[in-house]
């Protein structure tokens, strides 16, 4: 019986991991920090939209990076291997420009 009891508790931990929340720091170019608590399985588009709304800027005017890689709207913290207190960097999107060649 103890084996049966242990097995469901392991499964519960697996389920808990799926719905687990982590805190992420979003740091802007001006070094301002906003902290977000997100589920591991939530699409990061929600975090990006919330950040842009707080900053009063359109979402397409900023780019969000985690460990140097651009974050897509459909990425989740779990897919990117994010952990508690990880940092997302935000930069002004640069458009235009010309070749110097």
UniProtKB/Swiss-Prot annotation:
Its GO CC terms are: cytosol; glutamatergic synapse; nuclear body; nuclear membrane; nuclear pore; nuclear speck; nuclear stress granule; nucleolus
Q: Which SMART domains match?
A: UBQ
Post-translational modification note:
Cleavage of precursor form by SENP1 or SENP2 is necessary for function. Polymeric SUMO1 chains undergo polyubiquitination by RNF4.
Its predominant location is nucleus
- Write out the function statement from the record: Ubiquitin-like protein that can be covalently attached to proteins as a monomer or a lysine-linked polymer. Covalent attachment via an isopeptide bond to its substrates requires prior activation by the E1 complex SAE1-SAE2 and linkage to the E2 enzyme UBE2I, and can be promoted by E3 ligases such as PIAS1-4, RANBP2 or CBX4. This post-translational modification on lysine residues of proteins plays a crucial role in a number of cellular processes such as nuclear transport, DNA replication and repair, mitosis and signal transduction.
Region span, (Microbial infection) Interaction with Tula hantavirus: 16-25, 37-40
Show the cross-link location (Glycyl lysine isopeptide (Lys-Gly) (interchain with G-Cter in SUMO2)).
7, 16-17, 23, 37, 39, 45-46
Q: Indicate what this protein is called per its UniProt record.
A: Small ubiquitin-related modifier 1
Illness: Non-syndromic orofacial cleft 10: A birth defect consisting of cleft lips with or without cleft palate. Cleft lips are associated with cleft palate in two-third of cases. A cleft lip can occur on one or both sides and range in severity from a simple notch in the upper lip to a complete opening in the lip extending into the floor of the nostril and involving the upper gum.
Q: Which cysteines are joined by disulfide bonds?
A: none
Compartment(s) where it occurs, according to its Swiss-Prot or TrEMBL record = Nucleus membrane; Nucleus speckle; Cytoplasm; Nucleus, PML body
| Record propeptide residues | 98-101
What residues does the Ubiquitin-like domain cover? 20-97
Cross-link type Glycyl lysine isopeptide (Lys-Gly) (interchain with G-Cter in SUMO1), residue numbers: 7, 25
Q: Which residues carry this modification: Phosphoserine?
A: 2, 9, 32
Q: Which GO terms describe its molecular function?
A: enzyme binding; potassium channel regulator activity; protein tag activity; RNA binding; small protein activating enzyme binding; transcription factor binding; transporter activator activity; ubiquitin protein ligase binding
**CDD domains the record matches:** Ubl_SUMO1 (cd16114)
Indicate the cross-link positions, Glycyl lysine isopeptide (Gly-Lys) (interchain with K-? in acceptor proteins).
Answer: 97
Which residues are annotated as modified residue N-acetylserine in the UniProt record?
A: 2
GO BP annotations, alphabetical order: cellular response to cadmium ion; cellular response to heat; DNA repair; negative regulation of action potential; negative regulation of delayed rectifier potassium channel activity; negative regulation of DNA binding; negative regulation of DNA-binding transcription factor activity; negative regulation of DNA-templated transcription
Tell me yes or no: is Cell membrane among this UniProt entry's keywords: yes
> Which terms are listed as keywords in the entry?
Acetylation, Cell membrane, Chromosomal rearrangement, Cytoplasm, Host-virus interaction, Isopeptide bond, Membrane, Nucleus, Phosphoprotein, Ubl conjugation, Ubl conjugation pathway
InterPro entries reported for this sequence: Rad60/SUMO-like_dom (IPR022617), SUMO1_Ubl (IPR046332), Ubiquitin-like_dom (IPR000626), Ubiquitin-like_domsf (IPR029071)
Instruction: Give the protein family.
Output: Belongs to the ubiquitin family. SUMO subfamily.
The UniProt subunit note reads as follows: Covalently attached to KCNB1; UBE2I increases cross-linking with KCNB1 and PIAS1 decreases cross-links with KCNB1. Interacts with SAE2, RANBP2, PIAS1 and PIAS2. Interacts with PRKN. Covalently attached to a number of proteins such as IKFZ1, PML, RANGAP1, HIPK2, SP100, p53, p73-alpha, MDM2, JUN, DNMT3B and TDG. Also interacts with HIF1A, HIPK2, HIPK3, CHD3, EXOSC9, RAD51 and RAD52. Interacts with USP25 (via ts SIM domain); the interaction weakly sumoylates USP25. Interacts with SIMC1, CASP8AP2, RNF111 and SOBP (via SIM domains). Interacts with BHLHE40/DEC1. Interacts with RWDD3.
Which organism encodes this protein?
Answer: Homo sapiens
Task: Cite the position(s) of the site with description Interaction with PIAS2.
Answer: 36
């Amino acid at each position: 019986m103890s084996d049966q009891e242990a097995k469901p508790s392991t499964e519960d931990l697996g389920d808990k991991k799926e719905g687990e929340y982590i805190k992420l720091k979003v740091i802007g170019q001006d070094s301002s920090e906003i902290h977000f608590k997100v589920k591991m399985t939530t699409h990061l588009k929600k975090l990006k939209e919330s950040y842009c709304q707080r900053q009063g800027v359109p979402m397409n005017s900023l780019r969000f990076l985690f460990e140097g890689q651009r974050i897509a709207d459909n990425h989740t913290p779990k897919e990117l291997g994010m952990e508690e207190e990880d940092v997302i960097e935000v930069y002004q999107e640069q458009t235009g420009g010309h070749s110097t060649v």
